[in-house]
Amino acid sequence: MLFRMKDEKAHQLEAELDKLQAEGPAAWAKLPEEELFTPAGFSEERAEATSYSNYSYWGSTFRAFFKNRVAVLLLVALIAVVAFAFLQPYLPGQVDPNLCAVDPVTGIQYRNIAPGEKGFIWGSNAIGQDLWARIWAGARTSLTIAFFVALIEAVVGITAGVLWGYVRQLDFFFTELYNICDNVPSTIILILISYVASPSVQTLILGMSITGWIAMARFIRNQILIIRDRDYNVASRCIGTPTSRIVVRNLLPYLVSVIMLRMALTIPAAIGSEVFITYIGLGLSVEVPSLGNLINDGRKVMMQAGLRYQLLYPTIILSFVTIAFYLIGNAFSDAADPKNHLQ
């Protein structure tokens, strides 16, 4: 019965409309305003379906990241360790990491003092230097090298990768440059630079960065090739959008997750390279504390049961920083993927 009433009403309205159209505009002018305009009813479901989305990329990224409790816990711990490493020299009661402590009565050096004895929190080494001060100083040195290497590789690698993948005329040049650099082991270049130049923080940063960016560039290039000719990029080029704007607005946001992951992996890799180059005797001098120097010194006494703490503590710091950066980088990469933002 209800459907029949609706059909009859619809037919009646159609008949009236046909009559008005046949009579012309004069018939419409005679109608009162109430019959010409009818307010549309409000529907919450319809409004919700057509409303503006309040989506925020970075807001969704951080919400997804903070759901990973392990990554958040590691991030808090890593921030605490890094902050303490750089603030430690300014705390009260700290000593020079290169100071060789001696007994004020006998004048004998405090050699190989066990942790917790005579004011040495993590013990002392063979010449009486405080391992607590040296390990945190070494962490500062290694982290500084790693941060600068990651920053240089990211800036140079992203720039070269975008040009390599987006500008077709540069493809041959970057491909040949990649083939040349890729066929020379980065370890050999690092050893040569450390051997020719005097070992220093700047030398290590240069040696690690001089070829490290090429891997980032190739990775970015491959990602750019995937999205370069998608419809929205083709449309942007057709309407004359500047290349720089296309790169910044269309390409780089798509690559945030993979860039963050690569940078997070570069930091522990740089620390590992510093440890290796110091281990073979071409790294920083012993006057410059670094995790590589400390681990190398601890390796020499690791067979002596009472002195293994000299290898244990710097290894713990190195392992924690390496694992934390790796897991946090993976977690942030997953969180930055828009596919994981769906509720």
Tell me what each language-model feature is:
Residues 1-154, 158, 162, 169, ...:
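Gly/Trp-centered helix-boundary motif
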Residues 75-77, 145-149, 177, 190, ...:
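Hydrophobic core positions of alpha-helical segments in small-molecule transporters
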Residues 121, 152-157, 162-230, 260:
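Generic hydrophobic transmembrane alpha-helix motif, especially the helices
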Residues 129-144, 148, 168-171, 175, ...:
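Amphipathic cytosolic juxtamembrane alpha-helices at the membrane-cytosol interface
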Residues 150, 209-212, 222-223, 262-267, ...:
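Residue-level hotspots within the lipid-embedded alpha helices of multi-pass solute transporters
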Residues 160-164, 193, 220, 233, ...:
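Hydrophobic alpha-helical interface/terminus motif in multipass membrane transporters
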Residues 178, 218-257, 333-342:
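Intracellular coupling helices
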Residues 191-192, 196, 200-205, 209-212, ...:
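Non-cytoplasmic
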